[in-house]
């Protein structure tokens, strides 16, 4: 836990303003078909009320994954705090084969000891499948809960949890000196803070491979420019400000390169910068428009959008150049793709018959699945464990963030309370 906290502490920046108007997940579809589980309210072993409802956070995480459906506390046959207090038969009677129990205990030094146990109620009744404890200060209680959620999720699903990840996005507010804000929040919308404020548009945030930096597009100089901002100290480095368009940054998974699109020669084309030397090399060169690069896990191959066949479609090409290969064939156009961390699938904005939705393309079988049914969907970004996609869509007169599971069954919304929200980007594991 200490090592994890060292990584996460870089986000507690003195210069960042923590916001109260936060986005929160509202589930809209799919939790009823998920696996039932018991997450018992964690026992509070101190005076007064607990500073955080850790059990509720764990339950919300598991529910937000789309793979689990925690039962309501009023339906629980008992509320044990330890594995030894669990009566397995009482839970299996409700169709529940695993129960999470835990407690939070205050310490004399002002810290808190958070402990949990994951208990099997059917296969080997009473067996503890996973357990851990974390000593944290008050501000890290939510993080401790997310850590427990990650461990429970991985034990039960075999998939690494992503509840300690973050999302970056751009918020446009009405009026004020700085109506554009680049913000970062926990994956569930909590602990939101401002990374950068601007009087001019901000676009296309992209995370570095280690989660310590964000690249994005700014128009503060009067024209587009690409910058990289270090989250720990706020330092901003300009990496591209050529004539015409500079946009669509994407860090390679190995952290050594940044791909982006420039139109300095007329048409939009892809370029790659070596982040060590600063050298910029062209990837594509032609009269068609080539943009929106995203990396495959080998850090050598790019998926991107091109109109070389007339309408926008997704292609792939070696980052050192070479002949492009078309990837998408279904739908009148496909654009703004994101490749999963394992390289097995990509998601894209697909247009067909006037509709614009997020689709998933299985890169092994070629199967295509439309994941969303919202309006004018844009800019999908895949969670690092490949289970969820965050994207923006139109709702009323504004833009909001939406979540959909990569099997299409679970859907949720993160409604904004103080502006239009666009360009979501899911962080790597932190």
UniProtKB/Swiss-Prot annotation:
Family listed: Belongs to the TolB family.
Lineage top rank: taxon: Bacteria
A Gene Ontology BP annotation from the UniProt entry: cell division
Tagged with keyword Cell cycle: yes
InterPro entries hit by this protein: 6-blade_b-propeller_TolB-like, PD40, Tol-Pal_TolB, TolB_N
Alphabetized HAMAP family for the sequence: TolB
Subcellular localization(s) per the UniProt record: Periplasm
Keywords in alphabetical order: Cell cycle, Cell division, Periplasm, Signal
Function: Part of the Tol-Pal system, which plays a role in outer membrane invagination during cell division and is important for maintaining outer membrane integrity. TolB occupies a key intermediary position in the Tol-Pal system because it communicates directly with both membrane-embedded components, Pal in the outer membrane and TolA in the inner membrane.
Primary location recorded for the protein, binned into one broad class: periplasm
The keyword Cell division belongs to this UniProt entry's keyword annotation: yes
Record's signal peptide: 1-21
Quaternary structure and interacting proteins, as annotated: The Tol-Pal system is composed of five core proteins: the inner membrane proteins TolA, TolQ and TolR, the periplasmic protein TolB and the outer membrane protein Pal. They form a network linking the inner and outer membranes and the peptidoglycan layer.
Protein name: Tol-Pal system protein TolB
GO cellular component: periplasmic space
Residue stretches in coiled coil: none
Gene label: tolB
């Amino acid at each position: 836990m200490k090592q994890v906290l060292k990584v996460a502490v870089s986000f507690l920046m003195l210069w960042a303003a923590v916001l109260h108007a936060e986005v929160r997940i509202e589930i809209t579809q799919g939790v009823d078909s998920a696996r039932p589980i018991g997450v018992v309210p964690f026992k509070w072993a101190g005076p007064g009320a607990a500073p955080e409802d850790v059990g509720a956070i764990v339950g919300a995480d598991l529910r937000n994954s789309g793979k689990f459906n925690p039962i309501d506390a009023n339906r629980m046959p008992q509320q044990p705090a330890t594995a030894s207090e669990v009566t397995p038969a009482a839970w299996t009677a409700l169709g529940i084969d695993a129960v999470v129990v835990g407690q939070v205990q205050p310490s004399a030094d002002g810290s808190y000891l958070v402990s949990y146990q994951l208990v099997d109620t059917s296969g080997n009744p009473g067996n503890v499948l996973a357990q851990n404890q974390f000593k944290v200060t008050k501000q890290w209680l939510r993080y401790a809960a997310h850590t427990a959620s990650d461990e429970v999720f991985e034990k039960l699903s075999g998939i690494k949890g992503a509840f300690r990840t973050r999302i970056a996005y751009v918020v446009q507010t009405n009026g004020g000196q700085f109506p554009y804000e680049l913000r970062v929040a926990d994956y569930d919308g909590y602990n939101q803070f401002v990374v950068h404020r601007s009087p001019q548009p901000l676009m296309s945030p992209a995370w570095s491979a280690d989660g310590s930096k964000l690249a994005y597009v700014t128009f503060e100089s009067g024209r587009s420019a690409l910058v990289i901002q270090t989250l720990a100290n706020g330092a901003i480095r300009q990496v591209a400000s050529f004539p015409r368009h500079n946009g669509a940054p994407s860090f390679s998974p190995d952290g050594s390169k940044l791909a982006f699109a420039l139109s300095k020669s007329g048409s939009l084309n892809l370029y790659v910068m070596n982040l060590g030397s600063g050298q910029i090399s062209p990837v594509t060169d032609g009269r068609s428009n080539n943009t929106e690069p995203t990396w495959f896990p080998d850090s050598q191959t790019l998926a991107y959008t091109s109109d070389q066949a007339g309408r926008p479609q997704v292609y792939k090409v070696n980052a050192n150049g070479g002949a492009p290969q078309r990837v998408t064939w279904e739908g009148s156009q496909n654009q703004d793709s994101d490749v999963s961390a394992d390289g097995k699938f990509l998601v894209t904005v697909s247009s067909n018959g006037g509709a614009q939705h997020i689709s998933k393309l299985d890169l092994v079988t070629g199967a295509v699945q439309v994941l969303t049914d919202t309006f004018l969907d844009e800019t999908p970004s895949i969670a690092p464990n490949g289970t969820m996609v965050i994207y923006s869509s139109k709702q009323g007169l504004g833009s909001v963030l939406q979540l959909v599971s990569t099997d299409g069954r679970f859907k949720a919304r993160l409604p904004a309370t103080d502006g239009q929200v666009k360009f979501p980007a899911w962080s790597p594991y932190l």
